[in-house]
Amino acid sequence: MKVLITGSAGRVGRAIYIKLMSNYNVVGMDKAPCSTADFVGDIRDQHLIQRALQDIDVIIHTAALHAPHVGLHSDDDFYTINVEATEQLALLGIEAGVKQFIFTSTTALYGSASTPLGQAGWVNEDIIPKPKSIYHKTKIAAEAKLEAISVKHKLPITVLQMSRCFPEPADTMALFRNSRGIDARDVANAHLCAIEKKLSGFNRFIISGVTPYSKKDCQPLYKQADKVIIEKIPALADAFKERGWLLPTSLDRVYDSTRAQQQLGWHPKHDFNSVLAMLDDESAEVLPVLKSN
């Protein structure tokens, strides 16, 4: 089976490329030259896409403008890259005989729906988004385009909405692994599971770390998060104490990835212990915690 990964020079695209390359014939495409970019160029370039799609069975589309690009690129750029290029890629894939399309999206698109007043938000795939930025709006629009394409052309499309997945200070990353964060390696594995599960139709899943919290914890997490953490994750509380870090008194949301775990057979394994281990190993995947003066 041959798989095309767009955005293959990025953190997530590269992680997916490396995860798949031992079992699949993988080709990558990115605007940046890289060891995992077999095709180099603009995701909007139709002729480049057509060349890259030769003999491709599965498309994994990670290429996009992201939140850090807001204010640096025009709204038109966001629309042409995140929406129009996504639609074009799917349609050209259908012409080329692609059998499956996997779209890497984001939990950020839920916007203010993630943070209701007075309690932590419990966010699953049934929540109606309330976008706040052009990034959110274009990701929502891209998902809508893909759903319409899936229905019209009978192309199996799986959307994977990943939570926070970038280097942050270790205390923040460790906390978020239980509520709103994910390791790039677990994201890559989710894409592998989506390929192998071969779900029909259009499907959407939140990809985030396993949470020990439940819906009934939403109000306590917002008002007394430190007490909830001590009760639910004593090992994390102990690690914070040993390292001289303070537990937060409030958390504003929890992303629930239960549906992905159940329907894709996906099981994230890189929890807060992985964050601490990477910190101790001086990995570039996690930032040190700076002591306040």
Where are these regions (language model features)?
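Glycine/proline-rich active-site loop of Rossmann-fold NAD(P)-dependent oxidoreductases
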Residues: 140, 152-155, 167-177, 194-205, ...
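NAD(P)H-binding glycine-rich loop region in Rossmannoid oxidoreductase-like domains
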Residues: 43-81, 92
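Amphipathic terminal alpha-helices
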Residues: 257-263, 270-293
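Rossmann-fold cofactor-recognition segment
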Residues: 31-45
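Mid/C-terminal beta-alpha module of Rossmann-like enzyme folds, strongest
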Residues: 190-252, 257, 263, 289-291
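Conserved Rossmann-fold NAD(P)-dependent oxidoreductase catalytic core, especially the SDR/UDP-sugar
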Residues: 88-130
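N-terminal Rossmann NAD(P)H-binding glycine-rich loop of SDR-like oxidoreductase domains
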Residues: 3-23
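Catalytic helix-loop patch of NAD(P)-dependent Rossmann-fold dehydrogenases
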Residues: 80, 115-154
